[in-house]
Design a protein with these regions (language model features):
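Proline/Glycine/Serine-rich low-complexity intrinsically disordered segments
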Residues: 1-175
């Protein structure tokens, strides 16, 4: 597929059988089964470098926050932080650009993808400014009308050792 939302549409429409690196959400449970998490990562807010580190997300009352359209965190934010104004974006780079330009206060995603992208492309302008208590539990999602498929992937995930997980992280993390 060309982007995350197209991937979600394909799995919903049963044009594909699995989707990797997906977090469970109430909505997604209506059409997917999930393995246990492969990776568990903190959810963070990226801000401009000159913004203060936040101790409490309520300090952003009525601020615009960008979130990737279709990201599980959007449901969570709408439920638990309704005072934040969500701006859905088509890509992470679009969200980070809006932060850089001052059109939104921050962009929310998991720490792994954000820290890597900030270091590569936005190191002079953006930083991690807040960490939520919620975690992004990246799992494999399978069509819920194919329970045997979920059993197979669940066994594969159960067999992953910590060395393999660390190799994956090392591949995608810049130090």
């Amino acid at each position: 597929t060309n982007n995350w939302n197209e991937s979600l549409d394909f799995i919903k429409d049963k044009k594909c059988d699995i989707i990797s690196s997906i977090s469970p959400s109430y909505d997604r449970m209506s059409y997917l089964n999930f393995t246990k998490p492969i990776l568990t990562l903190p959810i963070v807010v990226t801000t401009q470098k000159d913004k203060p580190f936040l101790r409490d997300i309520s300090l952003l009352k009525n601020e615009k926050i960008a979130i990737l359209k279709g990201h599980f965190i959007a449901e969570y934010i709408k439920d638990y932080f309704p005072y934040l104004k969500i701006v859905e974006v088509a890509s992470m780079n679009e969200g980070l650009y809006l932060v850089e330009q001052g059109e939104v206060y921050g962009y929310i995603d998991n720490a792994l993808v954000l820290s890597s992208t900030i270091q590569k492309e936005f190191s002079n302008s953006l930083k991690i400014g807040f960490r939520f208590d919620i975690l992004d539990e990246l799992s494999i999602g399978t069509r819920n009308d194919e329970p045997i498929l979920n059993d197979i992937f669940s066994r594969l995930v159960d067999d992953l050792d910590e060395t393999k997980k660390q190799e994956f992280l090392n591949t995608w993390t810049i130090i």
